[in-house]
């Protein structure tokens, strides 16, 4: 007798109800292009820590190993003074901006910035160790400086970028973590904000939680969280708003090799080593290296050159929803830390005395952002509006559109005398003002609402765009053209001699 299989049958998942489509399917591009640029953007601060006497920031932390996340605010194209008003119908269409090109300008010379810790947890030099050191004492920390991993990054999208790092996780219900045990690790994804530290070569992790001794890494990251861009998560975004495209260059090599002082939490298994007659105790094997980014050169620069967006890697092909754009920049090739000294007396002695001078450290950043934006129109059909509402309801709200709720079949109470004291208060609550969804996040805001110009030939990036597209800029001044001959001159010319047959 035949019997059906008792194995579990797996049914394939159903097809998705709605399919994510590219913006090119419902966005129509026009031939109107604008140039916009920021002013010179400068930042000055201490490269290692912020100066906060009495919980008030006097000097911010500005390091060459921080993310610079620019929130670029664009004007509303539907309220824009357009040269041609016939390009769209305001009753059935809406206008949006599309980013088609940008150039991130960087000032300041190339340089290598160093960091360190005056009390770094470094025990032995395990790279060139001639003999074992004496038994470690209670405090073997030393003063060590190093240069970091070299990173250049430019990431563009219309939503904030995402970063990943390792933090302390929660143990399972059946498990427990005692004092001194290694905590469970958890991969955490969060928004990259302006001022967050990049991966310097010691890993993307929360050092405040996972290294509470504050001595295993340099000063600028020992209580911070180093984040690495979550490229996998942003690439998997169905709508592609967080990542139009990115440029990346990373390099590093291990410069020195040390080990840590402290009690080893996990001993080396006995089957991995043979103990010697004079070495019955296995030495410390908690190794680490100091990173180095090596040479910085102008031949490998990603900045101060234009980049054109023809096709984004996701479904959003450069459309700036919400009239905003996020540009994330990392450039460690200009991380020079300047040392500044100030005399403590009005007339210092002619003989050098180091106590008469105070030493300070500062780091400076210089940026210039230039963009090319193309005007686009969207025809508001029922299908397009439903799709936009599913993708981001805030888009239609910004265009003053709302969806009517379905009819309610329940019986509602309606009082006649609404202001009467005989009934409960019927005054509707005031509507809350729409808040910025990124209000609690820290970004470097760049306002371009009054920086748009259609005179492309008046700006460096605009001229590069005209040269790239082969479009000649119109000019009202004619240069190098000959004046046409007048009628009198042409009539006084000699007639041609006729050929005789």
Swiss-Prot record:
<dbReference type="GO" id="GO:0005198">
    <property type="term" value="F:structural molecule activity"/>
</dbReference>
<dbReference type="GO" id="GO:0042025">
    <property type="term" value="C:host cell nucleus"/>
</dbReference>
<keyword id="KW-1015">Disulfide bond</keyword>
<keyword id="KW-1161">Viral attachment to host cell</keyword>
<keyword id="KW-0946">Virion</keyword>
<feature type="region of interest" description="Disordered">
    <location>
        <begin position="476"/>
        <end position="501"/>
    </location>
</feature>
<dbReference type="GO" id="GO:0039620">
    <property type="term" value="C:T=7 icosahedral viral capsid"/>
</dbReference>
<comment type="function">
    <text>Forms an icosahedral capsid with a T=7 symmetry and a 50 nm diameter. The capsid is composed of 72 pentamers linked to each other by disulfide bonds and associated with L2 proteins. Binds to heparan sulfate proteoglycans on cell surface of basal layer keratinocytes to provide initial virion attachment. This binding mediates a conformational change in the virus capsid that facilitates efficient infection. The virion enters the host cell via endocytosis. During virus trafficking, L1 protein dissociates from the viral DNA and the genomic DNA is released to the host nucleus.</text>
</comment>
<comment type="similarity">
    <text>Belongs to the papillomaviridae L1 protein family.</text>
</comment>
<dbReference type="InterPro" id="IPR011222">
    <property type="entry name" value="dsDNA_vir_gr_I_capsid"/>
</dbReference>
<keyword id="KW-1164">Virus endocytosis by host</keyword>
<dbReference type="InterPro" id="IPR036973">
    <property type="entry name" value="Capsid_L1_sf_Papillomavir"/>
</dbReference>
<keyword id="KW-1160">Virus entry into host cell</keyword>
<protein>
    <recommendedName>
        <fullName>Major capsid protein L1</fullName>
    </recommendedName>
</protein>
<dbReference type="Pfam" id="PF00500">
    <property type="entry name" value="Late_protein_L1"/>
</dbReference>
<keyword id="KW-1162">Viral penetration into host cytoplasm</keyword>
<keyword id="KW-1145">T=7 icosahedral capsid protein</keyword>
<keyword id="KW-0426">Late protein</keyword>
<keyword id="KW-1048">Host nucleus</keyword>
<comment type="subunit">
    <text>Self-assembles into homopentamers. The capsid has an icosahedral symmetry and consists of 72 capsomers, with each capsomer being a pentamer of L1. Interacts with the minor capsid protein L2; this interaction is necessary for viral genome encapsidation. Interacts with protein E2; this interaction enhances E2-dependent replication and transcription activation.</text>
</comment>
<dbReference type="GO" id="GO:0075509">
    <property type="term" value="P:endocytosis involved in viral entry into host cell"/>
</dbReference>
<dbReference type="GO" id="GO:0019062">
    <property type="term" value="P:virion attachment to host cell"/>
</dbReference>
<keyword id="KW-0945">Host-virus interaction</keyword>
<keyword id="KW-0167">Capsid protein</keyword>
<dbReference type="InterPro" id="IPR002210">
    <property type="entry name" value="Capsid_L1_Papillomavir"/>
</dbReference>
């Amino acid at each position: 007798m035949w019997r059906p299989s008792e194995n579990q049958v797996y049914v394939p998942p159903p097809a998705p109800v709605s399919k994510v489509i590219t913006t090119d399917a419902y966005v129509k591009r026009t031939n109107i292009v604008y140039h916009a640029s920021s002013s010179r953007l400068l930042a000055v601060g201490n490269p290692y820590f912020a100066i906060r006497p009495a919980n008030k920031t006097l000097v911010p932390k500005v390091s060459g190993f921080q993310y610079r996340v620019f929130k670029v605010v664009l004007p509303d194209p539907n309220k824009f003074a357009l040269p041609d008003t016939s390009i769209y119908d305001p009753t059935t269409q809406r206008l949006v901006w599309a980013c088609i090109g940008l150039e991130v300008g960087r000032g300041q010379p190339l340089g290598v910035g160093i960091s360190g810790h005056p009390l770094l947890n470094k025990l032995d030099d395990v790279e060139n160790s001639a003999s074992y050191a004496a038994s470690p004492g209670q405090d073997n920390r030393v003063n060590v400086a190093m240069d970091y991993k070299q990173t250049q990054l430019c990431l563009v999208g219309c939503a904030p970028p995402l970063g990943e790092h390792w933090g302390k996780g929660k143990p399972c219900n059946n498990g427990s973590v005692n004092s001194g045990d290694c905590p469970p690790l958890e991969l955490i994804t969060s928004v990259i904000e302006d001022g967050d530290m990049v991966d310097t070569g010691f890993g993307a992790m929360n050092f405040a939680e996972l290294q509470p001794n504050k001595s295993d890494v340099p000063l600028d990251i020992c209580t911070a969280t180093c984040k690495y861009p979550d490229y996998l998560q942003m690439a998997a975004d169905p709508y592609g708003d967080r990542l139009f495209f990115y440029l990346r260059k990373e390099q590093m090599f291990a410069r020195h090799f040390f080990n840590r002082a402290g009690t080893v939490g996990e001993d080396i298994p006995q089957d991995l080593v043979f103990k010697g007659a004079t070495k019955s105790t296995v030495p410390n094997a908690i190794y680490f290296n100091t990173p180095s980014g090596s040479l910085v050169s102008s031949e490998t620069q990603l900045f101060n050159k234009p980049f054109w967006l023809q096709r984004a890697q996701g479904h959003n092909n450069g459309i700036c929803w919400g009239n905003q754009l996020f540009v994330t920049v990392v450039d460690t090739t200009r991380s020079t830390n300047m040392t500044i000294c100030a005399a403590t007396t009005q007339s210092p002695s002619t003989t050098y005395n180091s106590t008469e001078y105070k030493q300070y450290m500062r780091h400076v950043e210089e940026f210039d952002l230039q963009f090319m934006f193309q005007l686009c129109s969207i025809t508001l059909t029922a299908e397009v509006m439903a799709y936009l509402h599913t993708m981001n309801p805030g888009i239609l709200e910004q265009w003053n559109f709302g969806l009517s709720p379905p009819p309610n079949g329940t019986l509602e109470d309606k009082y006649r005398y609404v202001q009467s004291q005989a009934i409960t208060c019927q005054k509707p609550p005031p509507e809350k003002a729409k808040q910025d969804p990124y209000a609690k996040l820290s970004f470097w805001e760049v306002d371009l609402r009054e920086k748009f110009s259609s005179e492309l030939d008046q700006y460096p990036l605009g001229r590069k765009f005209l040269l790239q597209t082969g479009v000649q800029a119109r000019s009202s001044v004619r240069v190098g053209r000959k004046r046409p001959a007048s009628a009198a001159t042409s009539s006084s010319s000699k007639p041609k001699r006729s050929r005789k047959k």
